A protein has these predicted regions:
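Zinc-dependent deaminase catalytic domain
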Residues: 1-133
Length: 133
């Protein structure tokens, strides 16, 4: 396990979400240029789930938080690597493709693989760090 993957796991612990904590790091030229974890938008109360433990529809995924944070910085993600603790969904995969990220390393599979398949179709190198099949 590389240090960036381990750091993404530690970053996930910042999430206020109870059901699932996900962390993401964008690395370029061996430097972390952005980070994110799943949670509510800025200015919202840090409650990810409703009274029935269902995730609120406005909760942002870790990848989306990391990528949108880049949009407000002087960095760009062209040719970078995204380390994320869980497999990106289809919506985050579209953001990853459009942001110029060229490599995604993830540690936990999701029941749907449409996001992974879309990134591969777009020519992004996708690496799963879990058990070999």
């Amino acid at each position: 396990v590389c240090s960036s993957d381990l750091m993404a796991k530690i970053w996930a612990e910042n999430s206020y979400c109870k059901r699932r904590q996900v962390g993401a790091l964008v690395v370029k030229d061996k430097m972390i240029i952005s980070d994110g974890y799943n949670g509510t938008p800025s200015g919202f109360e840090n409650l990810c789930e409703d009274a029935n433990n269902v995730t609120q529809p406005y909760v942002l995924h870790a990848e989306a938080n990391a990528i949108t944070k880049l949009a407000r910085s002087n960095n760009n993600s062209d040719g970078s690597t995204l380390y994320v603790t869980a497999s990106p969904c289809i919506e985050c995969s579209k953001l990853i493709i459009q942001s110029g990220i060229k490599r995604v390393v993830y540690g936990e599979k999701y029941r749907l693989e449409d996001g992974i398949n879309l990134m591969k179709k777009a020519g992004i190198e996708v690496i799963y760090l879990g058990e070999k099949e």
